[in-house]
Amino acid sequence: MSLVFDKWELDEVKVEDMGLAKYICLDSILVPHTMGRHVKRQFAKSKVSIVERLINKVMRTERNSGKKNKAYKIVQEAFEIINRRTKENPVQILVKAVENTSPREETTRIKYGGIGYQVAVDISPQRRVDLSLGFITRGAMQAAFKNKKSIEECLANEIMLAAEYDTRSFAIQKKEEKERIARSAH
């Protein structure tokens, strides 16, 4: 049995949101790096480990663009901080944060006769997970920018706040904003 970062088991991690269960991959993997084998098939990224998807989202930001090893170390240290503070499996905390920050509705623009309307639509589970991971990493990057706190601390803090559904979390704020806009478009 392999462990994430050679420390945490994925067997004990549970996904409570049944809509996301199929899209949050918890396969055992020692080093979360698949070298982009999933990009050629449409829904193959749902088979990529949730930890690797978080690493890829951290890597996509301006400062860490293309630096997979740096992003790997950021996520690994953030997981260490989460484990020290909560004494729980950090992958379970991450899964809880993804469940809490994934929006269920958003708006899309539809044109009828040259006039554009905003219409509320349900979000697919794949997009919900993508948006959630994006909100978490963007919140961590914004918290770490021009701040004494390291990116690792900010990422750990953002994940823990999101897992507790704390409104101080950037990801929770963005989720609620997206759902509020969708409700007003009904």
UniProtKB/Swiss-Prot annotation:
GO cellular component term, pick one: small ribosomal subunit
Keywords tagged on the record: Ribonucleoprotein, Ribosomal protein, RNA-binding, rRNA-binding
Keyword 4Fe-4S recorded: no
GO annotation, biological process: translation
Cited Pfam families: Ribosomal_S7
A molecular-function term among this protein's GO annotations: rRNA binding
Keyword RNA-binding part of the UniProt annotation: yes
Record's function text: One of the primary rRNA binding proteins, it binds directly to 16S rRNA where it nucleates assembly of the head domain of the 30S subunit. Is located at the subunit interface close to the decoding center.
Protein name per Swiss-Prot or TrEMBL: Small ribosomal subunit protein uS7
Species of origin: Methanothermobacter thermautotrophicus (strain ATCC 29096 / DSM 1053 / JCM 10044 / NBRC 100330 / Delta H)
Gene: rps7
